[in-house]
Amino acid sequence: MFKIVSKYVYSDIFEVIDSANSYEEALNLKHEYELSFMSAYTIEIVEA
């Protein structure tokens, strides 16, 4: 399982915003969130 984690640019707080069962699904979700949030957030994939 993989977690999609976001971090607001002006803060050090991380938040789990979604999860995925496969790495490929996690990459797709990460891409969608990056398109939605633009540069306001850093989006990362973390293996759980």
Task: Specify the residue positions occupied by each region the protein language model found.
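A short beta-strand micro-motif
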Residues: 2-7
